[in-house]
């Protein structure tokens, strides 16, 4: 019985809320409508505030009140998690009110919307790339902004996510046995993320990939491909002389050199 009573109270409460919004929408008093909308916004009832803000567009457009209304309308979309729409609204705000004291904030929020849409590393990273581009554009446009540090942090986090994405792609080639493609992909990782603290790990994967590529090649191609492994090992030792992976690299260099010598001896005997 108590459960039904509570359910009835919920129904009455939500019906009352819906009724208030409906009555406000029908009102011809724009000041009253705006006041209700701002109350909804202050109470974080962004879905209701959004409806009223949108209804006030044709009435307040061109008036001093329109800037603040549009600003809150954009934030309503953002707080509701509608980041794609919010991005477009913040962009339009900057274009419509370029001299506003809120324009810088809106510009930052536009970039933030792309960042919020950035998915897991395994998925398409278009929005991650856009977030980086927009944040860099924000830094270039507003170099003295207090938001520069946060924008820089987001760029770094986004770049790290792209690095993980590219690593997983390279790793997949390796796990599937496409060793030449893996070697090329791991080389690209090193080139694209020169400041990564995993550079020596990526380089070792280049070496291992080329080694397995040589090992699985036809006999006529093996010597030149082991030479490639040796060249990559030498490059590793030049770049990362203090790496904990040096012994592993020296193993692959020695193995490749021994394989070449073995092939040469076999060829001499065959001759």
Which residues make up each language-model segment?
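Sec-dependent bacterial lipoprotein signal peptides
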Residues: 1-17
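Acidic, polar-rich low-complexity tracts and alpha-helical solenoid repeat scaffolds
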Residues: 16-271
């Amino acid at each position: 019985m108590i459960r039904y009573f509570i359910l009835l109270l919920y129904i009455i409460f939500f019906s009352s809320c819906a009724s208030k919004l409906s009555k406000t929408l029908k009102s011809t008093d724009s000041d009253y409508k705006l006041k209700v909308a701002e109350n909804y916004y202050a109470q974080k009832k962004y879905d209701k505030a959004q409806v009223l803000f949108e209804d006030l567009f044709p009435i307040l457009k061109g008036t001093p009140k329109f800037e603040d209304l549009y600003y809150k309308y954009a934030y309503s979309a953002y707080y509701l998690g509608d980041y794609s729409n919010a991005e477009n609204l913040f962009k339009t705000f900057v274009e419509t009110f370029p001299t506003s004291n809120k324009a810088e904030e809106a510009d930052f929020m536009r970039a933030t919307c792309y960042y919020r849409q950035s998915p897991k590393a395994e998925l398409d990273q278009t929005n991650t790339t856009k977030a980086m581009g927009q944040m860099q554009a924000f830094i270039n446009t507003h170099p003295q902004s207090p938001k520069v540090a946060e924008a820089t942090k987001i760029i770094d986090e986004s770049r790290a996510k792209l690095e993980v994405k590219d690593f997983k792609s390279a790793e997949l080639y390796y796990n599937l046995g496409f060793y030449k493609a893996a070697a090329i992909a791991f080389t690209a990782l090193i080139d694209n993320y020169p400041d990564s603290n995993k550079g020596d790990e990526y380089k070792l994967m280049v070496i291992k990939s080329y080694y397995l590529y040589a090992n699985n090649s036809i006999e006529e191609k093996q010597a030149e491909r082991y030479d490639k492994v040796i060249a990559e090992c030498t490059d590793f030792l030049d770049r990362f002389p203090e790496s904990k992976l040096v012994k592993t690299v020296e193993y692959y260099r020695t193995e490749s050199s021994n394989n070449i010598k073995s092939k040469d001896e076999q060829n001499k005997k065959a001759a």
